[in-house]
Amino acid sequence: MSDVENQPFFNIQRVYLKDMSLEQPNSPAIFLEQDMPSVEVEVDVKADRLAESVFEVVVSGTVTAKVKDKVAFLIEAKQAGIFDIRNIPDEQLDPLVGIACPTILFPYLRSNIADAITRAGFPPIHLAEINFQALYEQRLAQLQQQAGAAGAPNGAPNGTTLN
């Protein structure tokens, strides 16, 4: 094999909106409320190996806005990307898939959620940046804690993508 074939390779094949739903269970009455809504945001990352060097990474976001105890809206969205990743050592692969890929996808998710919220007739909500490295490290610590409690060795098995 030539040196070119053994070079680390990272390529975004596709970025796409995999799923989105918006619910407004209390419309139109909720538009008459004067109080500011409370907003709750949840974000999750999942990754699947589709082929030897091809991964699908999905960043999911859920935004729930409530006025008092009434739901103004609930939006759930999944922004996905297909990444071609080759010649990367296993110990670097999980962080690449768990940190770099979600960091690439999140601005798309944030934009799609903000657009859906304003199109639904609500004031814009701009999601803050997310430190995916901290999220990854937190998830890794949880896995190590679970593995320790189960009597297994610490860390994710080699080649396992953290979900």
Curated annotation (Swiss-Prot):
One Pfam match: SecB
Xref: InterPro entries: SecB, SecB-like_sf
Name of the gene: secB
Its job: One of the proteins required for the normal export of preproteins out of the cell cytoplasm. It is a molecular chaperone that binds to a subset of precursor proteins, maintaining them in a translocation-competent state. It also specifically binds to its receptor SecA.
Subunit structure: Homotetramer, a dimer of dimers. One homotetramer interacts with 1 SecA dimer.
Keywords recorded for this protein, A-Z: Chaperone, Cytoplasm, Protein transport, Translocation, Transport
PANTHER family xrefs: PROTEIN-EXPORT PROTEIN SECB, PTHR36918
GO CC field: cytoplasm
GO BP of this protein: protein folding; protein tetramerization; protein transport
Family named by the database record: Belongs to the SecB family.
The UniProt record lists the keyword Nucleotidyltransferase: no
GO molecular function, one term: unfolded protein binding
Compartments where found: Cytoplasm
Name listed for the protein in its UniProt record: Protein-export protein SecB
